[in-house]
């Protein structure tokens, strides 16, 4: 009886380590911005994230043009240049400083799709889903760590 109880406690503790931040928890529609742009999904509650393309402060709100990527278990966007789920625009009341929310920072939004907006990407007309964001979650910058491996000081392999 003690072993299963200990195993259960360890499982619960380990699961707590990989949880989502509280503002990003909840039930959300499972489709991507690309899928939303192909059909009308107005009113759906979504949790999308990705990398910032540009930030547009307006008189009463701030809009973010985003490249969407898949979200991990913690709702943080994966960082992969070729893994895109389309683009979207997320707007939130208030001022968000473009110096802090700079290009390529990772952000996760929750909110409701309020409509669609046509914008140009180069010469291409792109249909952006527009999200009225309830939560704007800016993730910390990922630190790059250079791992340096040095050869062993002895001429044979192994630790002995």
What kind of region is each of these model predictions?
Residues 1-17:
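Sec-dependent bacterial lipoprotein signal peptides
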Residues 17-160:
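OB-fold and OB-like single-stranded nucleic-acid-recognition modules
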